[in-house]
Amino acid sequence: MKDKSIKVLEFNKIQEILKNYTCTKAAKDIIEDLKPYDSMYEVREHLEETKEAFKLLITKGAPPFEGVYDIRSGISLAEKGSALLPGQLLKIAAVLRCARRFKEYINHKEEEESYRVLENICEGIFSLPKIEEEIFNAIEGEDEIADRASSTLYNIRRSLKEKNYSVRDKINSLVRSYSSYLQENIYTVRGDRYVLPVKAEHKGAVPGLVHDQSSTGATLFIEPMSLVNLNNEIKELMLKEKAEIERILTVLSAKINANITGVKTDANIVWELDFIFAKAKFASEYNCTCPTINDEGIVDIIEGRHPLIDRREVVPISVKLGEEFTSLMITGPNTGGKTVTLKTVGLIHLMAMSGLMIPARENSVISYFNNVFADIGDEQSIEQSLSTFSSHMKNIVEIMDKADENSLVLFDELGAGTDPTEGAALAISILENLRKRGTKIIATTHYSELKAYALRKEGVENASVEFDVETLRPTYRLLIGIPGKSNAFEISKRLGLPDYIIDFARENISNENIRFEELIENLQEKSIKAEEDARLAENLKLERDKEKKKYEEKLEGLQKVRDNALIDARREAKNIIKEAKEEADKILKDIRQLERMGYSSDARRKLEEERKKLKDKLDSIEEKEIKTVHEGEALKNVKEGDEVLLASINQKVIVLSKPDNKGDVLVQAGIMKITANIKDLRAAKGSNSNNSSSKIKKSKKLNLNLRRVESSVDLRGMDAEEAIYTVDKYLDEAYLGGLGEVTIVHGKGTGVLRKTIMDMLKGHSHVKKYRLGEYGEGGTGVTVVELK
């Protein structure tokens, strides 16, 4: 692929936008080197990885890239056997953790989901949890080694703490004793040694060693002789602490060195995934789709948009090439939007061949070309003393030398910059030569000769960019099959040129040319009308489908509400009666106790009667429910995916798990998952639960309306009540959205909000487990929640 064409089509600007979606410098470097791939297989594989990442973003939210760093310098030092700094080790551990969690993120999927390319990439992850754990256990911050890093360090620091207590007690006593000689009644530290701020004129009153003096010389910092031994002991312990820390860092660095292959592999995979998900985030932001790729030269871009033009202003274009025709001549006036069309086609091809999804509608088709050549814009070079024509011709000579049947060539204003007759003849000759080679061509021109060439030559098609003569602005809509007209007379008239000049100009044009231009104008009007009708029909169809979907969803929602209300009402009724029965049993027990003590049994008889009424009522409810159940005995065996009848609520449910040793199974009733006993299950009408041919896929109800659920929620600034409501609602959305792990940001502060949230999480139905954030995740300011 020619670097010049890549530059002319502004692919470098796409690279710069992509970099904004990465987390690491390493991923940015990958993007910096990104170019179209060398084979169609590579293009398809890299497009597939982008598509899979895009799907994961929609269904699972943001991937676990928290705390990902560029650790290339740390790896390089470890590879040489050098001891790493605490911060370098922490960053390596954070990347290893990210690799491990990403593998879990990919593997945590439903049965019907498949992420072939990403799963293959993640298969290469070594996962080094032991090293990761040792580093996080030993190091608490960029410059902080934990006491638990080793028993030796723990003992040294404990002794150091005791010595510091002793010396502080001693020096506080000395402060009181020498208070009249001190600048202030305090002590301070100089060079890790406790000293007193003694007035210079009283230095002889405090026997000891002078360590420093103030900038004015009025104060001397003296270490009292009685503290020298204690300070020496503290200094020795500090040296031992430093040596032990260096030993710990050396040991941890050696473990990185011993596993350097795994560390490098995991880091490289994380950076590659960072790059892949940057492509997916770009696709999400720019409403991109994954095109179909072929190597037959067939192009069908449906409503493609130039990604560098403001999305509020860009007009989609649809371009076909390679089936009915292999050359497309876009004609019309200058500033008519022809160049934008060329650049859109060229840039979309470069994006697709670089593994990027494209800003176009679904079902767009892109051909893999070995080369994309672009001669666009004024490449005039003052230094080389080349005219516009010479500059273009220099590019064209190079294109003619290298273009073949696997090339796409984009010409802007072919033949311009010289005598129109000669320029048009030369342009036709160039186009015809390339056409015979099988090269796919899109060229812009305002020469009438090229319109005629396209009309009479098989395999060449005319096209034009619609121009609004009222506003004197192009609409940028591409009309294939219709040559463009110059609109010179209309534009001149709108700009105020006198009619008599325009009329005289018309008289100097042949009748054939006038009729040709009128024919073109008529064709344009009909084409525009046909396109508007087609667009209106499409919009009506989309509106109808949207309304249909809305009412179907509303109906489904009402059905779920009804089912849930019925389940809740029945359960509540049974619970009320059951609780009343249990209360009656308790009172009866108390009355029996009173009878044994000699009290009257009248109350007991009355309560027995009430208890019997309650029992009869409960039995009656259960009997009514049983009558509504499909006749048949309780099932003895069920398996995952069976559709059965849950007798207690008289509703069809899906079996989600095998019976445990108590006979309990997990079933799904509507959107609810509940536990039932196998004795309460019956065969559903129209299904054979023991030999079901219709397997229901075990899955959460994913939020497939493409509404993205974020992987974190921020509670900072909320009071406890608002925070609890927000978290409860968020966890429901995250659970239904299929997220495996989420982060709750509550801040550090006083810890009240953190405790409130943790108390709430203890009994939440969607929560499997939770923990405080680790290094790189936000520490104690966040809580990481794993969902069921």
Swiss-Prot record:
Binding residues for ATP: 332-339
Pfam families according to UniProt: MSSS, MutS_V, Smr
Domain Smr: 713-788
PROSITE patterns in the record: DNA_MISMATCH_REPAIR_2, SMR
One GO BP: mismatch repair
PANTHER family referenced in this protein's UniProt entry, alphabetically: OS10G0509000 PROTEIN, OS10G0509000 PROTEIN-RELATED
Family assignment from sequence similarity: Belongs to the DNA mismatch repair MutS family. MutS2 subfamily.
Documented EC number(s): 3.1.-.-, 3.6.4.-
Keywords from the named record: ATP-binding, DNA-binding, Endonuclease, Hydrolase, Nuclease, Nucleotide-binding, RNA-binding, rRNA-binding
InterPro entries: DNA_mismatch_repair_MutS_C, DNA_mismatch_repair_MutS_core, DNA_mismatch_repair_MutS_sf, MSSS, MutS, MutS2, P-loop_NTPase, Smr_dom
Transmembrane segments: none
Single Gene Ontology MF annotation: mismatched DNA binding
The keyword DNA-binding appears for this protein: yes
Organism: Clostridium botulinum (strain Kyoto / Type A2)
Role played: Endonuclease that is involved in the suppression of homologous recombination and thus may have a key role in the control of bacterial genetic diversity.
Protein name: Endonuclease MutS2
HAMAP family tied to this protein: MutS2
Chain's gene name: mutS2
Subunit structure: Homodimer. Binds to stalled ribosomes, contacting rRNA.
